[in-house]
């Protein structure tokens, strides 16, 4: 086979502050994951890699070991390094088109049990769907915090009722990338993304009203709907294209059947779906025709693997009736709880609810995020994070294909943080969850994402944690736990 040669002048990925050996490995990793290098291709020798990148033999060797640990290359005695064979991709889960009648959310304790273990130290992968700590810009945020504290000590005690004007300006400036034009005064800052969703629901619906939402859906949305005394109507969703517009059309033909629709169109949690542009247009048009508002969460929209950021539903909103919600909690600063919403024509009601029910938030943290956005740090961070998540998603998908038993299906997200896995029908994901918890393997059972029983043989994993030999070992063990149920 012809030996693979790399362009010496090609940019090394990932960029510093990663160790040099990871930067050297990054070029090979990119060539492998994009398909330029295929299973069985011979790779440059250690000596050649040293010459190509001007590094020491120990650095080149560490680069190959790092790639070996990720399952991307293999060493053959007396022959050198080769691209490792890739496992056959698993098929995608299929759309379950069944619809349940609208009903009050009745928690069965499983979600509460999941939340109790969500902060369990040492779990790998972790239970929480967010970027791993080593991928977060903690050092930069600490530096900005110290700098802003010196310049503006008053921020530690001063509170702006509508939130930081600087942050609202930065959010408005960046909104154009998602296809929507916003004025800073149209933006309301919140204590995280879920508070934004909570305020939005209270602004457009009341106890007893029916809320249409994707099925499966993020379990905290079900918890919020339950806390407000509302009913949920689960609309079937496809793991690739998201909410079924046809099913929503059918469900809303009776006037007043649905008071609002809640949707995560870009890289939905738990399935990772990305709604096509035409479906986004159809959804907004259908909501306008039937007279119900749409509450949109775009918390994962910046985590795209492709070149283009997908537009938000609100970019198609001529009636100003889409309430756009987002936050910086998944990819920048989980502990800051900085979120925001653009409520459109519901702004006054959302402001009233916010002012009556919660604090404006910590202005210092809002100012830190604002400066992070303004000085280019956010863009640099997101480029690195997206590259890392794309690699981690592929590594996890390969491991699942390698270690899980036959009969499994796997979503193929084009961004976000979540993988949705369909197990053989006879597997009970609750039992998988219970055993995995005992062994510190962070897995979410499908039943937490629905009020029905249709996802009892599904699980959600996330790929926010950097790929390590320990993570691969835990996934291999998870595959064994699943296989044990098959006998």
For the regions a language model picked out, list residue spans one by one.
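N-terminal basic, amphipathic alpha-helical segments
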Residues: 1-147, 327, 351, 355-362, ...
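Short glycine/serine/threonine/alanine-rich loop segments
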Residues: 55, 72, 230, 292, ...
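Short beta-strand "wing" residues that participate in macromolecule-binding interfaces
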Residues: 74-75, 182, 443
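Conserved core of the PLP fold type I
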Residues: 150-290, 295, 301-317, 389, ...
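Conserved core segment of the aminotransferase class I/II
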Residues: 318-387
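Conserved PLP-dependent catalytic core of the aminotransferase class-I/II
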Residues: 382-408
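AMP-binding (ANL) adenylation modules
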Residues: 449-453
């Amino acid at each position: 086979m012809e030996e693979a040669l790399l362009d010496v002048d090609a940019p090394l990925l990932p960029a510093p502050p990663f160790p040099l050996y990871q930067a050297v490995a990054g070029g090979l990793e990119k060539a492998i994951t994009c398909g330029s290098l295929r299973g069985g291709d011979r790779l440059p020798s250690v000596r050649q890699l040293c010459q190509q990148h001007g590094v020491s033999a120990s650095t080149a060797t560490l680069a190959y070991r790092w790639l070996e640990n990720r399952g991307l290359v293999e060493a053959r005695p007396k022959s050198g390094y080769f691209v490792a064979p890739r496992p056959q991709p698993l098929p995608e889960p299929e759309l379950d088109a069944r619809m349940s009648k609208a009903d009050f959310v009745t928690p069965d304790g499983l979600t509460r049990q999941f939340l109790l273990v969500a902060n369990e130290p040492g779990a790998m992968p972790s239970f929480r769907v967010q970027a791993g700590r080593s991928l977060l810009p903690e050092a930069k945020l600490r530096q900005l915090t110290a700098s802003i504290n010196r310049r503006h000590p008053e921020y530690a005690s001063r509170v702006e009722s509508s939130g930081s004007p600087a942050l609202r300006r930065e959010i408005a400036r960046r909104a154009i990338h998602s296809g929507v034009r916003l004025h800073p005064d149209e933006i309301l800052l919140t204590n995280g993304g879920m508070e934004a969703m909570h305020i939005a629901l209270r602004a457009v619906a009341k106890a007893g009203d029916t809320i249409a939402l994707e099925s499966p859906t993020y379990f905290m949305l079900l918890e919020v709907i339950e806390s407000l005394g509302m009913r949920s109507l689960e609309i079937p969703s496809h793991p690739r294209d998201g909410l079924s517009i046809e099913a929503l059309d059918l469900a809303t033909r009776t006037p007043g059947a649905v008071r609002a629709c809640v949707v995560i169109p870009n890289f939905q949690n738990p399935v990772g779906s990305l709604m096509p542009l035409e479906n986004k247009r159809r959804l907004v048009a259908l909501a306008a025709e039937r007279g119900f508002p749409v509450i949109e969460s775009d918390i994962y929209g910046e985590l795209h693997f492709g070149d283009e950021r997908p537009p938000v539903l609100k970019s198609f909103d001529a009636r100003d009736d889409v309430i756009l919600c987002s936050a910086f909690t998944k990819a920048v600063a989980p502990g800051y709880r900085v979120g925001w919403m653009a409520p459109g024509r519901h702004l006054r009601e959302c402001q009233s609810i916010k002012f009556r029910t919660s604090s404006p938030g910590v202005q210092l943290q809002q100012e830190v995020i604002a400066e992070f956005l303004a000085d280019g740090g956010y863009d640099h961070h997101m480029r690195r994070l997206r590259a890392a998540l794309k690699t981690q998603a592929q590594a996890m998908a390969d491991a699942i294909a390698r270690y899980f038993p036959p009969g499994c299906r796997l979503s193929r997200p084009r961004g976000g943080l979540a993988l949705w896995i369909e197990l053989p029908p006879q597997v009970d994901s609750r039992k998988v969850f219970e055993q995995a918890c005992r062994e510190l393997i962070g897995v979410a059972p499908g039943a937490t994402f629905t009020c029905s029983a249709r996802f009892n043989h599904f699980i959600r994993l996330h790929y926010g944690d950097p790929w390590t030999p320990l993570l691969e070992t835990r996934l291999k063990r998870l595959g064994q736990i699943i296989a044990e149920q098959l006998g």
